[in-house]
UniProtKB/Swiss-Prot annotation:
Adenine binds at W36, W185, D211. InterPro entries: ABC-Purine-Binding, PnrA-like. It comes from the Bacteria. The keyword Ribonucleoprotein does not apply. The keyword Signal applies. Keywords: Signal. Belongs to the BMP lipoprotein family. This is Purine-binding protein BAB2_0673. Pfam families: Bmp (PF02608). One of its GO terms (cellular component) is plasma membrane. Transmembrane segments: none annotated. Residues 1-17 form the signal peptide.
Length: 350
């Protein structure tokens, strides 16, 4: 594959026969070898491996959300890509705008909720993995308090914090979670500073919804355990990582490209999780056998549908009742989640 630098971005792809389906990807960060963008790029490679000379792929990396995103999506559409994946929440409105201007192009937006005749939305139930992490954290923490590095206070991230909290409380009802927001999906410096600040505040477990390995490396340096994010980060902190929520986008990308090729593509809005294989857990490491066994059992129960992390009784942070015993949160509520559950030690930014 030819890689060329264009206007500060990396443009991957080689010119091949015109009849190939050209598939474009817009990335929030660099593909690198870890994290959110890495997993999307691995899925792109899986797409090429699965469909071979039927497809040609292109990507633009380090595309900022907002006006830059709209320009980049438009650029990649003008380049002849007929299927375009925009892989960050903040690309939603720019994707909607560009989709209107290119009705013959199919657009797929990750983690959002807006759709159009030629635009789908796809998301993963990351919160399912967060619940498993919470269970592990409560078993492994000696202090009963974990630190959580938040990226941007959108519902997806708030879901994860709350699910982590609920998983921990299923083991230790008095468990608490401290949160620091860095207001960025990828900023190694801020992520490292947040991890240090949380450890200084007394946490002995670190988890994150940010894209770099900075936090887990700080945890390693400070001698506490941590969780990876989006991909398996074990090689960066082999004695520190307990597990990671791993995003497996490959099967979805292959399915959608096949649909374009055979003419069956339709706009949809999907939210898949462990059951569908979009969310997986990295190997459970650096923990006693009994904790590993409980983690495996929890993962299996979520995957089978036996366990729904958002099942009452659950109280909000302010002490009010959210869900009665046995009551389950519906997807619409989760997709608009803008509050903490009880036990989270933070004021949610508005």
């Amino acid at each position: 594959m030819v890689i060329a630098t264009v206007a500060g971005f990396m443009l991957g792809g080689a010119a091949h026969a015109e009849e190939k389906l050209k598939v474009g990807f817009i990335y929030i960060g660099p593909p690198g070898d870890f994290g959110w963008t890495y997993q999307h790029d691995q899925a792109r490679k899986e797409l090429v491996e699965a469909l071979g000379d039927k497809v040609e792929t292109t990507f633009l990396e380090n595309v900022a959300e907002g006006a830059d995103a709209e320009r980049s999506i438009k650029r990649i559409a003008r380049a002849g890509n007929k299927l375009i994946f925009t892989t960050s929440f903040g690309y939603m409105d720019p994707t909607v705008k560009v989709a209107k201007k290119f009705p013959d192009v199919k657009f797929e937006h990750a983690t959002g909720y807006k759709t159009a005749d030629n635009m789908s939305a796809y998301n993963a139930r990351f919160y399912e993995g967060r619940y498993v992490q919470g269970v592990i954290a409560a078993k492994m923490s000696k202090k009963g308090i974990a630190g959580y590095i938040g990226s941007v206070p959108v519902p997806e991230v708030v879901q994860g914090i709350n699910s982590f909290m609920l998983g921990a409380q299923s083991v230790n009802p008095d468990f608490r979670v401290k949160v620091i927001w860095v207001n960025s999906w990828f900023d190694p410096g801020k992520e490292a500073d947040a991890a240090k600040a949380l450890i200084d505040q007394g946490v002995d477990i670190i988890t994150q919804h940010t894209d770099s390995t900075a936090a887990i490396q700080v945890a390693h340096d400070r001698g506490i355990k941590a969780f990876g994010q989006a991909s398996d980060m074990i090689k960066f902190a082999p004695d520190t990582q307990l597990t990671a929520v791993v995003d497996e986008w490959g099967p979805y990308y292959i399915d959608r490209a096949k649909a374009v090729l055979d003419g069956t593509w339709k706009s949809q809005n999907i939210w898949w999780g462990m059951k569908e294989g979009l969310v997986k857990m990295a190997p459970f490491t650096n923990m006693p056998d009994d904790v590993k066994k409980l983690a495996e059992e929890t993962e299996a129960r979520i995957k089978s549908g036996e366990l729904n992390p958002f099942t009452g009784p659950i109280k909000k942070q302010d002490g009010s009742e959210w869900l009665k015993a046995g009551e389950k949160a519906d997807d619409q509520t989760l997709l608009g989640m803008n509050f903490y559950v009880a036990g989270v030690d933070d004021k949610l930014p508005q």
